[in-house]
Amino acid sequence: MTNYRHILFPIDFSPQINAAIPYVAAFARQLDAKVTLMSVVPPIWAGRGPIPEYAADLEISTRARLDRTLTAEVHGLSVERAVRSGEPGEQIVRFAQENAVDLVMMPTHGYGVFRSLLIGSVTAKVLHDAHCPVWTAAHAAEQHARHIPKTMICCVDGTPKSVELMRWAAAFSGYFGATLQLLHVTPPIADWAAFAGDRKLQEEEREMARARIEALRSRAGVEAPMKVAVGPIVAAVAECASEEGADLLIIGRGLLGATLGRLRTHAHGIIQHSPCPVVSV
């Protein structure tokens, strides 16, 4: 299990960072981790290419602004500040890889009329490419999760990759002294509630899923209560998190665009609709 000694918190100076920073500070204190506050200056384009001389000026002004940002919120922590130029998602991923970052923490940024359905492109890039776990909060300002999580739910999809995810979740919850629950969601059979035969088939599917997850849990050597829910995956995960008062969801990223298990293909939806922050492993 990794020792979480370096947290990266990318900053774009948006209001969302003010809602996320209490979590960052709490995690850093609990894990005794260094925090790097990082801002990325995106390329300025004119005509056929970028204008590097403007980027240099922007780096200087961004660095000055970064030095003034969140000073009170991170007081007493081990903090470094970094400014890079380039495409934000790429620069965040590269910095994390080159500087032994153990955890990236960042709010999501979806904009426009579809904000409730989207996560920002930068967050999506980091989720897809980062080598380390990524903590995200789609609605940190409205969420009421405890900054030090005491209740964690690990969403497992029933594939062999779930074994390592369970082990990771058990170890991570131990850092915080948090309780851990396992959750698996099986999709509903169409109109199953209307027909006795379909209800029986649905219960058989639920029990087969329970047996499959139980076998994986045994392989993982994890002692945690397990729930198998039936319903649309994103909605069922959000509902369970609300009912259990979860402070943190744990999901497996895998290859977010690949068909490696239903929960992985629904990762973005789970993040966007979760009532609490999500860490993607």
Role assignments for model-derived ranges:
Residues 1-56, 150-199, 218, 225, ...:
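Small/aliphatic-rich secondary-structure junction motif
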Residues 36-38, 80-84, 135, 181-183, ...:
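General small-molecule cofactor/ligand-binding pocket signal
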Residues 54-64, 199-208:
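A short acidic, glycine-rich active-site loop
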Residues 17, 79, 114-115, 162, ...:
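Glycine/Thr-rich phosphate-binding loops of Rossmann-like dinucleotide-binding domains
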Residues 25, 71, 124, 170, ...:
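Active-site phosphate/pyrophosphate- and oxyanion-stabilizing loops and adjacent acidic/basic residues
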Residues 140-150:
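Intrinsically disordered, low-complexity Ser/Thr-rich linker and spacer segments
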Residues 3, 26, 30, 93-142, ...:
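Gly/Ser-rich helix-loop-strand patches that form or flank binding pockets
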Residues 1-3, 53-57, 71-104, 218-249, ...:
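Structural beta-alpha unit
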